[in-house]
Design a protein with these regions (language model features):
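A structural signal for small-residue-enriched, beta-sheet-centric alpha/beta enzyme cores
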Residues: 1-73
Length: 73
């Protein structure tokens, strides 16, 4: 495959990881001021699930891309 495409995939994974973490930080702050604490907890639980699944996936993709690009250098 194309090295440029592979690089784009790695960049996308890294950006997705950062976006998930940044969005969760905002959620953690904003749920503290919510009156509906049960709903706030539902949002926090969902955020934790998404972080658990997708941050590790993004790391795996990024690591695999880095390894492949380094081998081709």
């Amino acid at each position: 495959g194309s090295r440029m495409l592979l690089s784009d995939v790695g960049c996308g994974a890294a950006l997705a990881r950062g976006s998930l973490i940044a969005a969760s930080h905002t959620l953690f702050v904003n749920t503290r001021s919510m009156y509906d604490t049960a709903y706030a907890q539902t949002l926090l639980d969902e955020a934790d699930k998404l972080l658990d699944i997708y941050v590790s996936r993004a790391d795996a993709v990024s690591d695999a891309v880095s390894a492949q690009l380094r081998q081709e250098a």
